[in-house]
Amino acid sequence: LGRKVTLGQEVALVDASILPDDLLLAMPGEHNRLNAALAYRALAALNLDDEEIFEAMASFPGVEGRLQFIGEVNGVRIYNDNNSTTPQATIAGLEALAVDGERKIVLIAGGAYKNVDPTMMIDVIDRATKYVALLAGTGTDLIAEELDADVFDSLTAAVESALARAEAGDTLLFSPGFASFGMFRNEYDRNDQFVKIITTYAAE
């Protein structure tokens, strides 16, 4: 896995192997390590010090709503992947957090259809999750029957059910895979509501 990046007249083939094995990033997943490798190669071409680059990468907290770790509730790690509004993005989130051979992810997904076939998510969801809470919507209608999932008319109810099913050591992933139309004003409203709900639980 690699990408070409052009630096002036130089074209370099970059993959994640150029990063130190012990470099821990806040955002999990091989795709995020590849992004970091691209950033490293560009910064190194500007003659910046490797140690400073890697220190900055290790301290980078990530981007809000993109596999963002926002805390723990009763030993359950919570990731906010609200900006994943396509099936492909939700698949990437699941694969980033999945542990081989274990189904330790509790997933909250669902929403409004946006002209992308959502059925591509079904196999990955089945392999990686122990419980799925879906937000009602036109996209959810296309996958609900294929999944052993509960459908909810509010995000609050979905989070409540997901946390009730999760156990210490599990991961709760909020990765909608669909648009926010209908239940929310926009995706920013959806993001803010999720963070507010989790903050309330974490404070208990």
Where are these regions (language model features)?
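Short amphipathic alpha-helix with an adjacent loop that forms part of the alpha/beta core around
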Residues: 122-123, 161-165
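Acidic, Mg2+-coordinating active-site environments of NTP-dependent enzymes
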Residues: 1-78, 140, 144-145
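Short, flexible loop segments at boundaries between secondary-structure elements
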Residues: 195-204
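Active-site beta-alpha connecting loops in nucleotide-dependent enzymes
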Residues: 63, 82-151, 155, 179-180, ...
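Short beta-strands and strand-loop turn motifs
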Residues: 173-177
